[in-house]
Amino acid sequence: MNNQPSFRARVQKFGSFLSGMIMPNIGAFIAWGLITALFIPTGWWPNEQLAELVGPMITYLLPLLIGYTGGKMIYDVRGGVVGAAATMGVVVGADIPMFIGAMIMGPLGGFLIKKVDQVLQPKVRSGFEMLVNNFSAGILAAILAIVAFLGIGPVVVSFSNVLASGVEVIIGAGLLPLASIFIEPAKVLFLNNAINHGILSPIGIDQAASAGKSILFLLETNPGPGLGVLLAFMVFGKGMAKQSAPGAAVIHFAGGIHEIYFPYILMKPTLILAVIAGGMSGVFTFVLFNAGLVAVPSPGSIFALLAMTPRGEYAGVLAGVIIATVVSFVIASIILKTSKATAEDLTEATSKMEGLKGKESSVKEALITDDEQPQATEVNKIIFACDAGMGSSAMGASILRDKVKKAGLSIEVANTSINQLPDDVDIIITHKDLTDRAKAKNPHAEHISVENFLSSPKYDELVNRLKS
């Protein structure tokens, strides 16, 4: 049992690393998706000349961006350059979009050039640094590109074909709705970005390149299950949960920040049944309508889903979202109405969260003894950190930034991903399930755990403390 918290943290870290290669490049993916939806022969405005952008973007641009980002995550720009060059080997050596290959070669290139520098730099004489740095990177990049072209590329192609065939078998057997049994609980455990951008998106993009769309883009991004739970809290919830549910529903459905409904599930874990049932019914509807998207919608907003929907196929996408919402709402309403408890404090919710995760909560002690944690004496920078650094943390930072401004304090409030936490931050605010990872990344800062980024009493407590 003692090893499980570290194992969960490792899974989250690995998933965050995979999604970290995709998330910074989402704008490029959306650009490709829009060009595809607009200008291919079945698009809104078919244009043979502009449609020529589709192939090169998915074959070269997107994999190279992933490879560069993966290398940069390991060893800054130098790692990114070698990672991109290494990625070119798998791109040219394959006849399918090489996203999985890019996610391998990019970090590998960054890791190897980092090790090469560690060996060579202490031995380089003064005046030869630029020569050695440039040629060591160039030689290694050339070797990796050749190895990727001849060896790694064919292996990744075979692996991708096996994955694609497996997905086709699952879809053909009508088993795809069962994926929600795994996806929905994993989302609540903050693996949503890892699932969507690390697993489903690479396979889905391969499908979209050949078939023009992929249903895999809809599995994790469907806002229906979470919306149903939030609507149930709006009608049958109690206390703070009911008061905050309307705002959370708007942010979730329109803004696409799915993390906003996770605390509601963690407060009453039996609601996981509602989102699983909603997810399964939504996927079943997508299968019935043969629905799919041309590219990954990010964030998972209803507007992003509609923007990535092929022309003439809105009915299937909307039907899947609506049915998922209704099913999730009905089941969540039954659970809330039949629940004896009227409210839960944070300690009780944490204990129930242990049952949902099947392990002792690694943050329970931190939650109970939060007041005993060392506090920063001089505060100049406060960082909100989440898994991707773009969704829930941005929302929390905006709320606290407004409070700090109204209090007349000259303190920087920003947001980032846990993997990108700077060293000069004074206070780090994270969701309680991610605090351990943040402490491991930056153990010297003051860490504050919150249960809900949208509404936490700790914001006012912190502002009052900083004013005094």
From Swiss-Prot:
Catalytic machinery residues: 386
Keyword Transmembrane helix among UniProt keywords: yes
Coiled coil stretches, renumbered: none
PROSITE patterns, per database record: PTS_EIIB_TYPE_2, PTS_EIIC_TYPE_2
Catalytic activity of the protein: D-mannitol(out) + N(pros)-phospho-L-histidyl-[protein] = D-mannitol 1-phosphate(in) + L-histidyl-[protein]
Keywords tagged on the record: Cell membrane, Kinase, Membrane, Phosphoprotein, Phosphotransferase system, Sugar transport, Transferase, Transmembrane, Transmembrane helix, Transport
Regions of this protein lying in the Extracellular compartment: 48-51, 158-166, 295-314
A Pfam family that the UniProt record links to this protein: PTS_IIB
Membrane topology: Multi-pass membrane protein
Keyword check for Membrane: yes
CDD domains, per the entry: PTS_IIB_mannitol
SUPFAM superfamilies reported for this sequence: PTS system IIB component-like
Location of this chain's protein in the cell: Cell membrane
Record-annotated membrane-spanning stretches: 26-47, 52-72, 136-157, 167-187, 275-294, 315-336
GO cellular component: plasma membrane
Stretches assigned to the PTS EIIC type-2 domain: 14-344
Catalytic class of the enzyme: transferase
An example Gene Ontology molecular-function term: protein-phosphocysteine-sugar phosphotransferase activity
EC number of this enzyme: 2.7.1.197
Modified residues (Phosphocysteine): 386
Subunit and partners: Homodimer.
Matching PANTHER family: MANNITOL PERMEASE IIC COMPONENT, PTS SYSTEM MANNITOL-SPECIFIC EIICBA COMPONENT
Functional description taken from the UniProt entry: The phosphoenolpyruvate-dependent sugar phosphotransferase system (sugar PTS), a major carbohydrate active transport system, catalyzes the phosphorylation of incoming sugar substrates concomitantly with their translocation across the cell membrane. The enzyme II CmtAB PTS system is involved in D-mannitol transport.
Record's comment describing the protein's domains: The EIIC type-2 domain forms the PTS system translocation channel and contains the specific substrate-binding site. The PTS EIIB type-2 domain is phosphorylated by phospho-EIIA on a cysteinyl residue. Then, it transfers the phosphoryl group to the sugar substrate concomitantly with the sugar uptake processed by the PTS EIIC type-2 domain.
Name of the protein in its database record: PTS system mannitol-specific EIICB component
Organism this protein belongs to: Halalkalibacterium halodurans (strain ATCC BAA-125 / DSM 18197 / FERM 7344 / JCM 9153 / C-125) (Bacillus halodurans)
